[in-house]
Amino acid sequence: MPLKLRGKKKAKSKETAGLVEGEPTGAGGGSLSASRAPARRLVFHAQLAHGSATGRVEGFSSIQELYAQIAGAFEISPSEILYCTLNTPKIDMERLLGGQLGLEDFIFAHVKGIEKEVNVYKSEDSLGLTITDNGVGYAFIKRIKDGGVIDSVKTICVGDHIESINGENIVGWRHYDVAKKLKELKKEELFTMKLIEPKKAFEIELRSKAGKSSGEKIGCGRATLRLRSKGPATVEEMPSETKAKAIEKIDDVLELYMGIRDIDLATTMFEAGKDKVNPDEFAVALDETLGDFAFPDEFVFDVWGVIGDAKRRGL
């Protein structure tokens, strides 16, 4: 069925359409649970993170389809959406929408705001930042390390989308390709990044570094909608505490070796190894599932160690 904002509204510009009209602005409000969706008809509520009325989205099976529905509900282009957070309009990297969506989660879409171009002097081999992406072609900064090269450039913030590096457009690149590009930049040389920060409400916020805790927290004990790149979305139970901790540890290994965080990739790796009996079988499974990554042997062994620990604790 076509998506629309709740209630009748007159046509508005993008600027005035952001006014909240009689709907709660976050989780816990009355409308979030007012109409529980019947079987096979899952309805989610959404807002633009900088402020808007509440929209309803349903019937999507992938991140791309979800973005298209959110865009239709708010009369914007899907390409305007940088990423979404769950149950908070803040730029909270621990609340990013990935491949799993709780059935009662409230979606906040962060859209393009101010463009900026920054020059960075690469004084160290490591820039001190972690990259992730939204699954549909936009890479952005998930974490900035205290005291690192990027930390010294105060105009660069967590949540900024990286549009180009030294004039090369990287829209459509996956996070690992962007991280590799940045890593390969020559030391002791200046480089330029074009960034787009998410549009913000009229409030003053401190520059966020996203903390030192793990990425998106994987909850336990409730149902979730699992979005897939191929095939229909499925409703699943949230993982056990042991499995959730193992996936977060794999995400830590991804950050250590590749400079990225991706809870969905970590989940895929865990699923590929949970029924394997040795690291050789696991390596073969990774090649079959994620062959494009060409993971080094030491990385595979570290991930296998995490999975082995989880097995010993009981999944």
Curated annotation (Swiss-Prot):
Protein name in UniProt: PDZ domain-containing protein GIPC2
Keyword annotations from UniProtKB, A to Z: Cytoplasm
Record Gene3D superfamilies: 2.30.42.10
Region (Disordered): 1-34
Molecular function terms from GO: identical protein binding
Ranges annotated as biased composition (Basic residues): 1-12
Keyword Transferase included in the entry's annotation: no
Record family assignment: Belongs to the GIPC family.
Matching InterPro entries: GH2_GIPC, GIPC1-3_GH1, GIPC1/2/3, PDZ, PDZ_sf
GO cellular component: cytoplasm; extracellular exosome
Subunit relationships: Probably interacts with SEMA5A.
Tissue expression from the record: Expressed at highest levels in ascending colon and at moderate levels in adult kidney. Expressed at low levels in adult pancreas and at very low levels in adult liver. Expression is down-regulated in several primary tumors, such as kidney, colon and rectal tumors.
Subcellular location: Cytoplasm
CDD domains for this protein: GH2_GIPC, PDZ_GIPC2
Disulfide bonds: none
Domain PDZ: 117-197
A Pfam family matched in the record: GIPC1_GH2
Coiled-coil region(s): none
Organism expressing this protein natively: Homo sapiens (Human)
